[in-house]
C-alpha cells in the first residue's frame, strides 16, 4: 500500500487537523445505514487533504445507525442507549477505514472502548506517533463514556492530538443566523465567537464541545461536506466557510 504526498511547494495553513462529520453524512440519500458511494466520496475528500501532507484525525458520529438520545426518548436506559450509539460509531469508522485504505492511505481505527480484534485501544502517545507517520487516525466510540456526544469527543481528541483546528463538515457552507434551508434571508457568519454560538444556540456543536474548544483556543471551521473539494480548498485558503474563534 502506498500513499502519494503533495509536492513540497504546496502551501497549507495547517499541519494537523480534526475532521468531524455526522453519521448521517454517510447515508447519502438513504434514510438509514451506509451508502458506499458516499463513503467513498468522503474518503476522496480526505485523500486530497492527505496529499497536501496534512496530518488528519477523524471522528464520525453514529446517527445513521443508532442515536443514543432517540433510544433514551423511547424508554431505553440512557446509559445503554449511549453505549449502543458508541458501537455504531465503530461500525462507521471501520467503513471509512476500508474506503481510505482502498485509496492507498494507511489508516488506524482507535476506539475509546477496547475491542482489540477490530481496532486499536486509545493510547495518546501511540496515536500521535501514527499521525507523525502520516497515517489517518479515526477515533471511534466517542469518549468511551455515556452522556458525551461525538462533537465533544472530537474536541477532546483534537486537543489531545494538538490539532490546530476542528473542521466540522455539514450540509451547509457555514454557520447561519437561522436555517438557510428554510429561510431565504438567512445570513452566514464569516467569523463568530464561541460565546455567541452558545448564547444564540447557533447549532455549531453542543455546548460542552464549544466550551472545550473555547477554553483551549481551538478554532472550529464549519463548511459544506457536499461541496466537491471543499475540505481541501479551505486548507489552501479558498472556499466558503465560517470560522468559530474567541
Curated annotation (Swiss-Prot):
Top-level taxon of origin: Bacteria
Any one of the GO CC terms: cytoplasm
Keyword Transferase: yes
CDD domains linked: AAK_UMPK-PyrH-Ec
Residues annotated to bind ATP: 20-23, 63, 67, 170, 176, 179
Localization per Swiss-Prot or TrEMBL: Cytoplasm
GO MF annotation terms: ATP binding; UMP kinase activity
Start and end residues of each stretch annotated as Involved in allosteric activation by GTP: 28-33
Residues annotated as binding UMP: 62, 82, 143-150
Reported function: Catalyzes the reversible phosphorylation of UMP to UDP.
Record's protein name: Uridylate kinase
Species, as recorded: Cereibacter sphaeroides (strain ATCC 17023 / DSM 158 / JCM 6121 / CCUG 31486 / LMG 2827 / NBRC 12203 / NCIMB 8253 / ATH 2.4.1.) (Rhodobacter sphaeroides)
Upper taxonomic lineage: Bacteria, Pseudomonadati, Pseudomonadota, Alphaproteobacteria, Rhodobacterales
Gene name linked to the record: pyrH
Amino acid at each position: 500500500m502506498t500513499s502519494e504526498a503533495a509536492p513540497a511547494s504546496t502551501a497549507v495553513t495547517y499541519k494537523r487537523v480534526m475532521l468531524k462529520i455526522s453519521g448521517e453524512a454517510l447515508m447519502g440519500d438513504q434514510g438509514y445505514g451506509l451508502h458506499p458511494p458516499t463513503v467513498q466520496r468522503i474518503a476522496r475528500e480526505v485523500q486530497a487533504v492527505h496529499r497536501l501532507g496534512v496530518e488528519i484525525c477523524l471522528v464520525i458520529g453514529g446517527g445513521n445507525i443508532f442515536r443514543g438520545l432517540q433510544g433514551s426518548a423511547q424508554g431505553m436506559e440512557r446509559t445503554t442507549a449511549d453505549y449502543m450509539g458508541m458501537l455504531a460509531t465503530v461500525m462507521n469508522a471501520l467503513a471509512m477505514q476500508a474506503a481510505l485504505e482502498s485509496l492507498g492511505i494507511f489508516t488506524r481505527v482507535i476506539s475509546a472502548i477496547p475491542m482489540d480484534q477490530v481496532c486499536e485501544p486509545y493510547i495518546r502517545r501511540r496515536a500521535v506517533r501514527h499521525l507523525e507517520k502520516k497515517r489517518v487516525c479515526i477515533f471511534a466510540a466517542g469518549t468511551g463514556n455515556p452522556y458525551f456526544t461525538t462533537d465533544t469527543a472530537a474536541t477532546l481528541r483534537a486537543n489531545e492530538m494538538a490539532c490546530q483546528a476542528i473542521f466540522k463538515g455539514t450540509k451547509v457552507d457555514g454557520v447561519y443566523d437561522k436555517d438557510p434551508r428554510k429561510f431565504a434571508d438567512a445570513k452566514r457568519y464569516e467569523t463568530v465567537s464561541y460565546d455567541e454560538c452558545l448564547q444564540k444556540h447557533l447549532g455549531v456543536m453542543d455546548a460542552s464541545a464549544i466550551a472545550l474548544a473555547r477554553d483551549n483556543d481551538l478554532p472550529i471551521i464549519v463548511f459544506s461536506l457536499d461541496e466537491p473539494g471543499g475540505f481541501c480548498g479551505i486548507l489552501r485558503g479558498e472556499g466558503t466557510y465560517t470560522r468559530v474563534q474567541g
